[in-house]
Amino acid sequence: MALGGGTFTSQNKELPGAYINFVSAASASAALSDRGIATMPLELDWGVEGEVFEVTNEDFQKNSLKLFGYAFDSPKMIGLNDLFMGAKTLYAYRLNGGGDKAANTYATAKYCGVRGNDLKIVIQKNADDTSKYDVTTYFGTVKVDTQTVAKAADLVANDYVTFKAADLAVTAGTPLTGGTNGTVDGTAHQAYLDKIESYTYNTMGVVVTDDVTKKLYVAFNKRLRDELGIKFQLVVYNLSADYMGVISVKNKVTDTGWSEAALVYWVTGAESGCAVNKSCQNKKYDGGFTVDTNYTQNELKAAIKAGEFTFHKVNGVVRVLEDINSMVTTSDTCGDVFKDNQTIRVIDQLGNDDAVLFNTKYLGVVPNNASGRTSLWSDLVKIRTQLQELGAIEGFTDSDVTVAQGDSKKAVVITSAITVVNAMGKLYETVTVA
């Protein structure tokens, strides 16, 4: 069972855990966890089915053919290349599993998918021992495995095929055929969400254009952020979500064979990898897609007001206009500062790190007395001090954190004030000319 978490309005929670609210300051109107972790459900021609699988940036560059069916520099991998421009680790899930595996007389593809049809088996007599055969597996034009055996039963499955108990015979190349991708529907998306709920990551991205699927992911994001205390941001394409946890990408890509929503790959990676003391504002788009930036100045202003994460062209270079989320409606406790993704990175860092600290070090272990609360206070101060040293917050002092006993003997109430530092975004300059 997961520990309790999320926000609170009164001290009446039943599950043990950390419940944390972030509110705006009144106005006129232990260790920090790493970033760079993203998750995405993907439509693939090859790969693991029915499970979340972890891929690091290094894995992608070295093992892309084995993992995804194409070399990392293939045009088919532009999206994932964009993602790994910013992300260090991806928790991937294949949406279109459940299809047919390609096969021939000698072997069956390891995974379903149309890419399995590019496998072939070459069998030759061994030059040194004619009683044996050299059995070679090709993936496209790439030789991926060779084994020398006397009979098929001696063959060992490799990363691409499993072998059948067939009589070996010389062949210049017998292709595998019949591989198909599975279908993608709401059930596939829900299966991914069910699997990924227990993982920890900074951003989730989904490359879809229909509002029904987008709203499924928004509901998931809101439930985990607000009810379970699992802080992450969701990146979608062209949706007015009006929520700090959702980033809505305005621009489309114009590349043939790709969804117009494909910029979600790059934004998901960039936001996951952006340091807690940094911003993506004015960040150069260094990905592989052609971005539609055909907007007037007035349209760009309107996009900011609408909470749209927008790219624009500056001196021929595509850059991020503002590092904002989709939130547009403000209140006394949730002001304009929460529209900025740098603010969300800071509060998500605090929310996640405070919860991990409490749930792993204090929950059920440390007594709720003056000494125990002082220890918790000290650890909370350390986390905020580290953020201040990084330049993510400013003006923090020890007195900005208080830890007190709650309404019950087991409850602890923490009050914490922070001031988030945001990157420079506007320059107002007056020049006096003599």
State each model region's role.
Residues 2-23, 29-48, 52-56, 60, ...:
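A glycine- and small-residue-enriched flexible loop/hinge signal that marks low-structured segments
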Residues 70:
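Short gly/ser-rich anion-binding loops that grip negatively charged ligand groups
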Residues 383-390, 419-423:
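Hydrophobic alpha-helical segments
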